[in-house]
Amino acid sequence: MWWILGAFGTAALVLVLASVFLFRFALARRPLTEIPEGGEREYLKRHPKGQAQVEWWAGVREARRWTERQHTEEWETRSFDGLLLHALLISPAHPGNRVALCVHGYRSCGHGDFGQIQRFYLEQGLRVLLVDDRAHGKSQGNYLGFGWLDRLDCKAWCQELADRLGPDCSIVLHGVSMGAATVLAAAGEPLPSQVKGVIGDCGYTSAWDQFGHILKRDFHLPVFPLLYTASLVCRICAGYWFQEDAPVKQLEKSDLPLLIIHGEADDYVPTAMSRRLLAASRDPGKRLVLVPGAAHAQSYAVAPERYQQAVMEFFRRIGMA
């Protein structure tokens, strides 16, 4: 009898420890480790499969250098739970009243996910607000919101833009990966009337679906029981359940104009999730653009002209062209 109880106790302890590890591994704040310019060869010696990271950091540095030549302003706002959030406003030479609020993805940054897109937006005369997600960059926070807490941060940035730029400004929300989940979830919240539409690039349907997919793909593990207990740890430490973190449910409350873009070769966030997101939206003119051959968050890099065309058609529909 006692050995049975001991076995159950040991199994429970292992499950708790594994759940805490999973939560901290996935959602605890960690700084980005930059590959310094000139250090690529040494990095590849240690990480033979790291060419994608090398190219990503090269793109970040190029975007930074470009941004330094533009007119920029550092912005801050306060989150609903008291965190100081940071963003960078980039303006064209002759700024108008249109602005793209750009939300980066998981453990990324604005220059990483919008390095090329921000140039396109400025060429079209838009201002660009690159936000640092909570627990990223210069924003405060110990744990990632994984799109759920961030949806309210996005709402706060929308209000900040509306307050500073006035009633005549027009705002489009644009997110990549976790940033897409953020703006899609924000679409289900009451937003300022200045918000005209939402662009989601390779977003997931819910945290539960996404973590479940990664558990199966990378670790060959079922969602039960680990994801249930990890969700409980997240609720205790970060304040939300994986199950409630569901952009797909938020879209059921939204009739904001919607454009979804997704790479057909994405095996990190399955393309099927975008189809479910599209189906959930109440926007009668909603559109899904699939990019053949594009892996996760690579649609713009693979097909920039098609991406730009889809965005401009969307802008014409919402009166922001």
What are these regions, as identified by a protein language model?
Residues 1-56:
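N-terminal membrane-anchoring alpha-helices
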Residues 51-95:
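N-terminal cap/lid segment of alpha/beta-hydrolase-fold proteins
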Residues 106-120, 133:
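The serine-hydrolase catalytic nucleophile loop
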Residues 121-140:
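Conserved alpha/beta-hydrolase
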Residues 144-165:
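Alpha/beta-hydrolase active-site loop
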Residues 185-241, 249:
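Hydrolase active-site cap/lid region
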Residues 253-255, 260-262, 266:
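Short beta-strand/loop motif that positions the catalytic acidic residue
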Residues 267-273:
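Conserved alpha/beta-hydrolase "acid-adjacent" motif
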